[in-house]
Amino acid sequence: MAFLPMNIKEVKARGWDEVDFVYVMGDSYVDHPSFGAAIITRVLEDCGYKVAVLSQPDWKNDADFLQFGKPRLGFFVTAGNIDSMVAHYTVAKRKRSDDAYTAGGKNGKRPDRAVTVYSNIIRRLYPDSVIIIGGLEASLRRFAHYDYWKNTVMPSVLFDSKADIISYGMGELQTIEMAKRLSEGYPVEALYDIRGICYAVKTSDYVPKTVVELPSYERVCESKKDYAIAARKELEEADAVRGKTLIQRHGNFILIQNPPMQPLDTKQLDYVYSLPYERWYPQCYEKLGGVPGIQEVLFSITHNRGCFGACNFCSLAFHQGRAVRSKQSVIDEAKSFLNDKRFKGYISDVGGPTANFRLPSCEKQKKAGLCKSRKCLAPTPCPNMQVSHTEYLDILRELRKLDGIKKVFIRSGIRFDYLMEDQSDEFFEELVKYHISGQLRVAPEHCSAAVLDRMGKPHIETYKKFCDKFYKLTGRMSKDQYIVPYLMSSHPGSTLKDAVELALFCKRENIHPKQVQDFYPTPGTISTCMFYTGIDPYTMKEVYVPKTEEEKSMQRALLQYFIPENKQKVIKALIKAGRKDLIGYDSKCLVQPMSNQNNYKGNNKGQKSSYNSNKNNSRNKNGKQTKDKFAKYRRKKK
C-alpha cells in the first residue's frame, strides 16, 4: 500500500511521465474509507488509472494547479467531506477557527465555495480539459438553490464553476464509466447518457425528451411558490428505481439531470471497502499535528449506506443511495485492525448514516422505489415496513467473538422509532449490554408535534417509550449508561411557544443540553426550502419561520434555561410567548425573576452541565433506581 502522489516529485518517483486524472480537493488528504475522496481515488487507481491528488491548493497562486501539467483525461474537483461554507461558518455566519478536515485543525486552507473557485482556476489554465465536479458541495447545489450565506437564490453550481459535468451522489459507478469512456477517446458529450450526472446544453441544441421540467432558475428567483414546487419535484425524483430525468432552464441553457445511479449492490460495496486504504494521512501532515477528523473514525466500520428515515433537514435522501455490505466483508475489515499496532481492541463504531438499517424499507421499495406520498417512519411507521435487526445482530455477535476485539461500540445514530417497531427485544438488549460506551446518541430533535411534522420526525411519545425501555434494561444490567438526545432550535415551524414547550420537556425529563444546534439552512434540503420560502413544499401551506437573530437566540436560550447567563433572554422569551407563569419560585417555573439575579443559582444546583443529566440521575452501580426520571410512567403501570 502507498498514498497516491500529492506533488510532481512523487509522480516522478513512480516513473510516470503524466497523470490520467488530477483529483483536486478542499480537505487535507486522508486515505480512509470514511472520506469520499479516498474511495473515488482508490477506485480509479484500481481501474488502472494514474491519479494525482491535489489537496488544498493555494487558490491565490497558480503554481499548485500547474505542477502536474494537463492530465491526460481530466480533473475531478470536490470541496471535501462537507460543504465549504458549512466548514467555514457557524449558523450565525461567524467564521470558524477550527477545521476537522485540515491538517493542524486550523481554518482557512480552502476558499469559500471551493468547488467553484478551484474549477474556475482550472478552466482558465486548461481551457479544453474535462472538469467533473462532485462531492457534497456540488451534489447539493446541482439545481438552482437558496444560498443561506448570500441570502439569495443561486444558479446550479455547474454554471458558476464552468465545469463540464456534476457527478452527484456517492459517485463510484458513474466515475468508473466516465473514466472508461474518456480513456477510450470519447469526447465529454459522449458521457451525457450516464446515470448520476448533470450537464448543460444550449436551449437551441436541446432535443425534447420525456422529462420532468422544474420551474426555471428565473422563476424560482421570482416566486417562492415555484421554488417550493421545484424542491418537491427534485426530491420526488431522487430515487434510483423510479426517478426520471429532470431539466431546469437557466437563461439560454438547460440543466439536465439524468436519473440517479443505481446504488452499489452488496458485492460492489464489499469491493469498495476492500481496497488498500492506508487508513491514515501522509507523513507530511505529522509536523502540523495531523488531521483531527481521522481520530473519530480510525477504527470504525461502515456496514451500510443511505437512510429511509428521510428527515427534512437531512441531505442523505438527496445524496446517498441505499446499500449494505456483507457480513464477511465487515468481519474482514475488523480482522485487518488486528494487524495495526495502533489498534487497542476497540472498534469505535459499526454503523453508517443510520446504524440499525440493513433491509429495504419494504418489499415494494426494491421494485417501485420509495413512495412519493408518504415517509416510511414519520409521523407513524408505515404498516408495510419490514423491521428486523437479525442481520445486524449477527454481524455484531461475530465481531465480539474475534480474538483481540475487546469492545464493539455503536456510535452512529440509532433510529429509535425503527427499533421500537421490532417485535423482538433481542437487539435492544444486546445493544444495552455490549455496544454503548456510556452514552447512546439518539435524535428526537424536538417535542412539539407541529415542529416534528415539519422535520419529518416521529412524535415524542415514541422517544419516551424508547427511553423508558432503555433505562429499564440499563438498570436490570447494572449499567451506568445514559441517553444523549440531540435537540434542534429554530427549525421552520418552531414558534416561541414551541420552544417553551421544548424547555419544559427538558425540565420534566431532567435533560440539560450542553450544546444546542440551531437549524442550519444548507442547500438541497426540504427544511431549507421551508426556511427560504415559508412554504411546506409537500402541502404548499405557509410555515412559520424564526429568522431574526433575536428570536433564534431566545429559542436557544430556552433550551439552556438553567444557565445563569441565559436568564435575561429566557425571561424575555417567556414574556413574549405569554408564559409569565413560568417566571417565579415554584418548582414548575423555568427561571426566577430578575430582581433576585444576584442570588440566582438555577434549578440545577449542584449538577454538572452535561448533555443529559441522566448520567447522574438514572441508576447507581448496583442497578437500583436513584432519581427516576420515568417514575410517572411506572406509577401508571402499578
Each predicted region: which residue ranges?
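N-terminal pre-triad scaffold of radical SAM enzymes
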Residues: 24-29, 288-312, 338, 346-348
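N-terminal [4Fe-4S]-dependent radical SAM core
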Residues: 1-18, 28, 225-300
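Flexible, glycine-rich loop/tail regions that form catalytic "lids" or insertion modules at the edges
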Residues: 13, 21-25, 66-67, 194-197, ...
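Glycine-rich beta-alpha loop elements in corrinoid/cobalamin-binding modules
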Residues: 10, 36, 55-250, 257-258
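Conserved SAM/AdoMet-binding glycine-rich loop
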Residues: 23, 58-59, 336-484, 488-492
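Flexible glycine/acidic-rich beta-alpha junction loops that bind and position SAM and/or redox cofactors
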Residues: 83-92, 140-142, 172-177, 202-205, ...
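Terminal amphipathic helices with adjacent charged low-complexity linkers/tails
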Residues: 60, 189-238, 252, 261, ...
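Conserved, mostly hydrophobic/aromatic
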Residues: 164, 272, 307, 330, ...
